[in-house]
């Protein structure tokens, strides 16, 4: 059924990150799950619980939860291996990356093939 999008969103899609310095595409790609995925919906519930409890960090935790992996991220010339902790650190310290992710994830067409 062409209306069923949850599976494609769960599988994920890749965003190519743009440099905040010059606006050019980088060689850094992040694989994310979309807003129709079960993972995203579960993470949103956790985000809402934190919001109600007036706890910090809910937005970053949400992004970490829907990040499946990455490739091409380097630090001092060495590859940075994907891990939840590394993603958390990136998202806290690179607001330009998180805003690109927010825009990408909210566009359902990024997750639909064809």
Placement of each model-derived feature along the sequence:
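Short, charged/polar N-terminal "headpieces" of proteins
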Residues: 1-50, 111-114
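Structural motif
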Residues: 51-59, 91-96
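Mid-chain, well-packed structural core segment of small domains
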Residues: 62-79
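Secondary-structure edge/capping motif, primarily at the C-terminal ends of alpha-helices
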Residues: 50-51, 77
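Residue-level detector of well-ordered alpha-helical segments, enriched
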Residues: 58-63, 100
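Residues that form generic nucleotide/phosphate-binding pockets
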Residues: 43-46, 50, 65-66, 89-90, ...
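Bulky hydrophobic/aromatic packing residues
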Residues: 14-18, 70, 95
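C-terminal charged interaction modules
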Residues: 76-114
